[in-house]
Amino acid sequence: MSSTDSVVAGQAKVTTWRKTDTRWVLGLFGTAIGAGVLFFPISAGIGGLLPIIFMLILAFPIAFFCHRALARLCLSGRSISDNITDTVDQHFGHVGGVVITFLYFFAICPLLWIYGVTITNTFIAFWQHQLLLPAINRGVVALAILLVMAFFIYFGKDLMVKVMGYLVFPFITCLVLISLSLIPYWTGDIFTSFDMHSLSLFGSHGILVTVWLGIAIMVFSFNFSPIVSSFVVSKREEYEADFGREYTEQKCAKIISRASVLMVVVVMFFAFSCLFTLSPQDMAQAKQQNIPILSYLANHFSSLGSGKSTYATVLEYGASIIALVAIFKSFFGHYLGTLEGLNGLIIKFGYHGEKSQAPMKKLNMISMVIIMGSTWVIAYINPNILDLIGAMGAPIIAALLCLLPMYAVWRVPALAKYKGKASNYFVTIIGLLTILNIVYQLM
């Protein structure tokens, strides 16, 4: 075969979409679709029709450009097996590695606290509204739930990993089915309450502030950054030796693009379906009650009384159960990340980074007590979940997902070719706006 024929054959092979690419599209999509999605309709719908339309326009650019920027940073590592920690160590030295370890821990730990509050509130709402049982002490409920989860995590972690993996796509399927099932209950309230004369761009309830606060929830909900490093390593091992790094970067971008489209379609359809069923006032009430949208929907159908259909009854109980399973799935996944981050900090400072010297069984137990204890305190205090996401969860995610890659583009020679791209300014602005949520929450 001539060299020309080899090139043509190689190009044909390059353009082929592989099964592994499809698996990663679904893997990235599945990582993002979790309990965080259950709060997005509340934040998006609380301002009415116009803000959620703006969020619809921003959804894909936020999901795609931010994750592509992080993937490019991961791709800049010298070896195809370098993960994000290795890559940051190469570019910024040991101090940079320590900073990333801190950011990684503090990006995930607040999310665990959020899910601790959420699962407590969801269980209490199910207990009182669906089971119609008398109120129980919040501290006891939170402690009991956390002890049960700690038991399963400590004694059956491997089994739980498998179970949670199997639950990802059934949860997504349920989310789509609920979105479709709500169609018969769509009302025109969102349109009848829409008044152009009462709209304002500025002010605490203006469109710009609502969209700004919504961006933080979007960064939180449309987030598959925890798996991007593993994804890039996998694609580099699969493609880079045969086709080069530039092609691998293009393939990663295409996979991220398709995952982002899938994610935006599912989440935004779910958000619009909830908004057409409820009203902005309902969304405000859901925020005040500090419960996810599925729990509020369950309570909404419960309030229909004896006149409700069997269909509505199924939705009522199904929504609550799906919410509990989704939150437990997200809690478990973020617990493992928090445990890894806390162990990493203890090993880095207590054992000078020598993992072989650390008694891992004892360390896991100490970390579990610290993590579960702090989660119980936060769950008992019951801070507003959307405010907690805006003040802690989303800003730290934005620092890792948006600002770190943009800083690397400015400073690292291997990423200099991406300087001056319009998408860089967009990603930087999204990161800064998300972090500025902290200032708004303190005002």
From Swiss-Prot:
Keywords: Amino-acid transport, Cell inner membrane, Cell membrane, Membrane, Symport, Transmembrane, Transmembrane helix, Transport. The keyword Transport applies. One of its GO terms (cellular component) is plasma membrane. It catalyses: L-threonine(in) + H(+)(in) = L-threonine(out) + H(+)(out); L-serine(in) + H(+)(in) = L-serine(out) + H(+)(out). The keyword Transferase does not apply. The gene is tdcC. Involved in the import of threonine and serine into the cell, with the concomitant import of a proton (symport system). The chain crosses the membrane at residues 24-44, 45-65, 95-115, 140-160, 163-183, 207-227, 259-279, 319-339, 363-383, 385-405, 423-443. It is found in: Cell inner membrane. It is a multi-pass membrane protein. Belongs to the amino acid/polyamine transporter 2 family. SdaC/TdcC subfamily. This is Threonine/serine transporter TdcC.
